[in-house]
UniProtKB/Swiss-Prot annotation:
Zn(2+) binds at E183, H247, H264. One of its GO terms (cellular component) is cytoplasm. It catalyses: 7-phospho-2-dehydro-3-deoxy-D-arabino-heptonate = 3-dehydroquinate + phosphate. It is found in: Cytoplasm. It comes from Coxiella burnetii (strain Dugway 5J108-111). Belongs to the sugar phosphate cyclases superfamily. Dehydroquinate synthase family. This is 3-dehydroquinate synthase. Pathway: Metabolic intermediate biosynthesis; chorismate biosynthesis; chorismate from D-erythrose 4-phosphate and phosphoenolpyruvate: step 2/7.
Amino acid sequence: MKTERVNVNVNNQPYPIYIGENLLQDKSLLQRHVKGRQVMIVSNETIAAFYLDPLKAIYQDFQCDTFILPDGEQYKTLEYWERILHKLACNHHRDTTLIALGGGVVGDITGFAAACYQRGVDFIQVPTTLLAQVDASIGGKTAVNHPVGKNLIGAFHQPKAVIIDLNTLNTLPEREFKAGMAEIVKAALIKDEKFFTDLENKMSDLLQRNFIFLQAVIKRAAEIKRDIVNADEKERSGERALLNLGHTFAHAIERLLGYGQWLHGEAVSAGLVLAAQLSHRKNLLDFESLQRICRLLTQISLPIHFPKSINADELLSAMYMDKKVANERLHLILLEDLGHAVVSDQVDDRELKSFLENG
């Protein structure tokens, strides 16, 4: 299989996204984006058991240190971010490179540590979950959670490279693999109706982890995010806000359930359906398109309803702790069509509460 490459260029700071097989064995590739002789690999307990030793062998001629996080969203906190910084402060200089080996949690906290250590050092994303490969590793958003809300403390800090080894998907549990599909569906809904149709036609092969199809859809999802991030790195124009389709609902669900009870992609799936239903209620999205979204997510075995244990008042209150609030108005991403998302602040509290209570 030929390795595919997607080039990102944010503020004249280009970096590549590589997508292929056996990239964790490619010494030349993995060393190419390290400018000094120090690296720190940050991973979690599960991923480290599979891939840490081979990656350390690539850097055997470097000072190579490691930091292993416990597994789970509940450890994406200031406490563990500070522990990473403390280990860096012991003997790492400004030309060190952090390597995030893992899923979205590892990538987010590693990127935030890299953004803050000595006012910013290099880092490389090596995402090992489908969700991280198509979304979290691309675009430079780094953060940790706070008890009040998800990703409330963070920074924009672009990686030097994103290295996606498709072989890491072989060790990904089925639930996490399917959760990652939610972000691929989101990318299609935002910008590319044809891509959405392709997902409908190829989903059976994708769920069988066919690498040829997976490489193609990961590349297309990465291109969609690349184009948006290139145009609006820090959500100034509103373009990047489109990537939050379903996420205002999703972040509230995650927080209310307790981080880790639902996977992020599972919450995103429910959030996508809520956004589509609200779009239909406001006469933006036709009923057949809404049905197609629900059918595709159901085929993946992802949730299309928010949990019954959460009531409308709780969900609405939690949504206001999200970052998509401006001038005390909630900005939601809605759909005018498959492949056409828009930013809206035209949903007031009364309408939103009625929608959440009655659908």
